[in-house]
């Protein structure tokens, strides 16, 4: 049954190089729905659900006047609408906030709610879809995935991951070229994002596709042991003097403690996640004290999620596709779902867009499977490389202005 009304879209959580491509897809899908007389106006919420509660809304049909603007948006990193990390409590705990949300939905005649985000954002989608249903307000709520962590269930991979993986693999490849100019023993440790899942760190192994890759790779999926690590490093140094170690920020000891915990303040975000960083520095100290060779650590930090200058064309195209698919799914009656990217079987890479019940996705984590990690727990298998490889293919043609990439700023 057709549902006529307005729509709203927001972005939440950590930005990526492709989250705006997904926003572009939602806008394109909404424009098509407008031509069909289904959607009247597409509002953009500034700073996610936080901005929505303040009625900080803009008419995106007015902001984006032509296809060129959308094309520029797709090549723009970070979240053009702004983001937030607000965690909605349950309706029972905070009835006032939910009543406010319903009031705003009715005020603007919003019948379609699209939320682009990662794991914690899907929790918001789940809560809103259930609340609307329990209060007899017809609202189609669709989660649109994005995360460089690639840790969302039900989808083969997430929009944003391919571009981040391409950046990580490229940066590791370039660092390897740099560290190999000297003959002295030296260890370079590259710390890569990934709290509970090591997908992004695993992608560093893609540097080996046309050259040398990292010598050692450590993921949160395997327990980290200091003695084994030192032994691994010593063995690699026997083969050549300069080695590179790729490590996830979230690796843990056998007792579950983060390796980098000693460098942390102990502070957590609104979702209860500890702030992580410093793992590379801890490993640097271990190498310095145990081996005594030259050692340095490099933290890729925010560059992993905002390097749109080296986006994966596959990732950008799929991100747009997922955004358009979200609108199509909603106008066809789906709600309480998250869009998925489904990979076709066979040697030739191909994907389609699907959707899955949000209840099985929110607050769950997809980790790197055992078959993608070598037996020693310090490298990526050929099966892992084959899974990752198609996701970084293709280059985005950028528009430059004054020698720098042009971005669309709302």
Language model features: what each stretch is:
Residues 1-58:
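N-terminal phosphate-binding or glycine-rich loops at protein starts, especially the Walker A/P-loop
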Residues 12-14, 45-50, 85-86, 118-119, ...:
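Short, ordered loop/turn segments at secondary-structure junctions
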Residues 16-26, 52-53, 89, 96-99, ...:
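Short glycine/serine/threonine-rich phosphate/pyrophosphate-binding segments
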Residues 36-45, 178-186, 243-245, 292-300, ...:
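Flexible, glycine/charged-enriched surface loops at secondary-structure junctions
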């Amino acid at each position: 049954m057709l549902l006529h009304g307005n729509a709203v879209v927001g972005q939440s959580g950590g930005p990526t190089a492709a989250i705006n491509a997904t926003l572009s897809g939602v806008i394109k899908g909404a424009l098509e729905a407008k031509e069909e007389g289904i959607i009247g106006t597409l509002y953009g919420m500034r700073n996610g659900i936080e901005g929505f509660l303040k009625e900080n809304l803009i008419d995106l049909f007015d902001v984006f006047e032509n296809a060129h603007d959308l094309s520029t948006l797709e090549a723009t990193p970070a979240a053009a609408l702004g983001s937030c990390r607000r965690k909605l409590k349950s309706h029972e705990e905070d009835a006032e906030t939910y009543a406010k949300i319903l009031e705003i939905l009715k005020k603007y005649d919003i019948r379609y709610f699209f939320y682009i985000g990662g794991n914690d954002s899907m929790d918001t989608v789940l809560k809103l879809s259930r609340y609307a249903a329990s209060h007899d307000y017809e609202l189609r709520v669709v989660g649109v995935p994005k995360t460089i962590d690639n840790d969302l269930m039900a989808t083969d991979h997430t929009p944003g991951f391919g571009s981040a993986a391409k950046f990580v693999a490229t940066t590791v490849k370039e660092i390897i070229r740099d560290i190999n100019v000297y003959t002295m023993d030296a260890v370079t440790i590259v710390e890569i994002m990934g709290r509970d899942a090591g997908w992004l760190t695993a992608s560093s192994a893609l540097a080996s596709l046309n050259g040398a890759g990292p010598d050692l790779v450590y993921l949160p999926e395997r327990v980290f042991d200091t003695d084994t690590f030192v032994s691994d490093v010593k063995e690699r140094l026997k083969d050549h003097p300069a080695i590179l170690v790729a490590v996830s920020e979230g690796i843990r000891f056998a007792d579950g403690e983060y390796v980098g915990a000693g460098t942390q303040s102990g502070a957590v975000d609104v979702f209860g996640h500890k702030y992580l960083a410093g793992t590379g520095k801890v490993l640097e100290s271990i190498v310095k004290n145990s081996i005594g060779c030259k050692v340095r650590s490099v933290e890729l930090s925010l560059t992993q999620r905002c390097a749109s200058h080296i986006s994966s064309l596959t990732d950008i195209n799929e991100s747009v596709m997922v955004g358009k698919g979200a609108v199509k799914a909603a106008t066809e009656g789906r709600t309480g779902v998250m869009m998925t990217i489904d990979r076709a079987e066979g040697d030739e890479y191909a994907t389609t867009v699907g959707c899955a019940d949000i209840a099985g996705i929110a607050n769950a984590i997809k980790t790197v499977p055992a078959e993608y990690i070598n037996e020693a727990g310090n490298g990526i298998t050929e099966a892992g490389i084959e899974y990752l490889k198609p996701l970084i293919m293709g280059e985005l043609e950028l528009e430059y202005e004054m020698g720098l990439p042009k971005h669309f700023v709302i």
